[in-house]
């Protein structure tokens, strides 16, 4: 028997982390989306500033995939409250899809596994990017740092991090319509074998560094010569910002998802005040307005009123 009403919340996320394209993402506590499921005669989406056509909305598309596959009636209202800013590389579409699936799981008492929830939520991403990529939704559902593999079967694993990291996110006031879809179209169709080998080594270095607390491995691992350069026109200030952050002892820096936001990993050695000032100066130099937020790693999606795990 469905519950009367269920609300779930899911955090924003930063995907790729340099070398981990479509495989690594981290949940951040800076912003959250909320989705409420309630009984309704027919299927209805509500919310401010979002597409209300379910086929064009990540939460709506994820919900349809879940309901239809499990043979459930579409007699629900889905109310979406956007807290994650759209189009800035912070997993906004993924947070909505993750919160919707989490709420539906609780509303119908389905007892879905994390992989099953991710599978439905990633279908929702088609509405935003044109492809069902699992990295952002995995982080928003599971929380923490998540590694995703998706060949014949989808597997998502939370990686335990050694160290106390804070994250500075440089968020420019730039908006590109259908940015994620456009950014994916900029990617190279093929890469040389030596580029693949170098990228694989960097991803391994990043994971090993985060698990061991080795900042040099993290710094090496968050470099990328494939995806970020192909999209540099979307964030021309990036390399200046990265050099500035590293000069002020940030552990590492990378484009957040498809941009245009930039993620900087900081620890006790980092001069965060100087990094903040440097971000403002670089935005000004490029005639861009923007802001800087500080975030911590977040837990995953949760049903409001239920216990929350870190």
From Swiss-Prot:
Its main location: cytoplasm. Coiled coil: none annotated. GO terms for molecular function: ATP binding; homoserine kinase activity. It is found in: Cytoplasm. It comes from the Archaea. GO terms for biological process: threonine biosynthetic process. Pfam families: GHMP_kinases_C, GHMP_kinases_N. ATP binds at residues 85-95. Its EC number is 2.7.1.39. One of its GO terms (cellular component) is cytoplasm. Pathway: Amino-acid biosynthesis; L-threonine biosynthesis; L-threonine from L-aspartate: step 4/5. It catalyses: L-homoserine + ATP = O-phospho-L-homoserine + ADP + H(+). InterPro entries: GHMP_kinase_C_dom (IPR013750), GHMP_kinase_C_sf (IPR036554), GHMP_kinase_N_dom (IPR006204), GHMP_knse_ATP-bd_CS (IPR006203), Homoserine_kinase (IPR000870), Ribosomal_Su5_D2-typ_SF (IPR020568), Ribsml_uS5_D2-typ_fold_subgr (IPR014721). Keywords: Amino-acid biosynthesis, ATP-binding, Cytoplasm, Kinase, Nucleotide-binding, Threonine biosynthesis, Transferase. Catalyzes the ATP-dependent phosphorylation of L-homoserine to L-homoserine phosphate. Belongs to the GHMP kinase family. Homoserine kinase subfamily. This is Homoserine kinase. It comes from Thermoplasma acidophilum (strain ATCC 25905 / DSM 1728 / JCM 9062 / NBRC 15155 / AMRC-C165).
């Amino acid at each position: 028997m469905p519950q009367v009403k269920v609300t779930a919340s899911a955090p924003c996320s930063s995907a790729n982390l340099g070398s981990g394209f479509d495989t690594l993402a981290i949940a951040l506590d800076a912003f959250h989306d909320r989705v409420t499921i309630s009984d309704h005669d027919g299927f209805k989406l509500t919310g401010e500033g979002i597409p209300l056509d379910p086929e064009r909305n990540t939460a709506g598309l994820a919900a349809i995939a879940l309901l239809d596959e499990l043979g459930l009636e579409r007699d629900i209202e889905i109310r979406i409250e956007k807290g994650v800013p759209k189009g800035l590389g912070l997993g906004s579409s993924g947070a909505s899809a993750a919160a919707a699936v989490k709420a539906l799981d609780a509303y119908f008492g389905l007892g879905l596994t994390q992989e099953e929830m991710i599978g439905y939520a990633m279908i929702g991403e088609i509405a935003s990017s044109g492809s069902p990529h699992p990295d952002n939704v995995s982080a928003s559902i599971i929380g923490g740092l998540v590694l995703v593999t998706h060949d014949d079967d989808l597997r998502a694993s939370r990686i335990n991090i050694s160290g106390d990291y804070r994250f500075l996110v440089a968020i420019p006031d730039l908006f590109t319509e259908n940015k994620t879809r456009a950014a994916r179209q900029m990617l190279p169709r093929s890469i040389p074998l030596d580029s693949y080998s170098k990228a694989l080594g960097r991803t391994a270095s990043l994971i090993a560094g985060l698990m061991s607390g080795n900042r040099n491995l993290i710094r090496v691992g968050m470099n990328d010569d494939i995806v970020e350069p192909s999209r540099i026109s979307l964030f021309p200030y990036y390399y200046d910002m990265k050099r500035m952050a590293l000069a002020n002892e940030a552990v590492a820096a990378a484009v957040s998802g498809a941009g245009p936001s930039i993620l900087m990993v900081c620890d006790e050695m980092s001069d965060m005040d100087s990094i903040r000032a440097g971000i403002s100066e670089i935005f000004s130099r490029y005639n861009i307005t923007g802001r800087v937020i500080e975030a911590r790693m977040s837990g995953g999606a949760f049903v409001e009123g239920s216990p929350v795990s870190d």
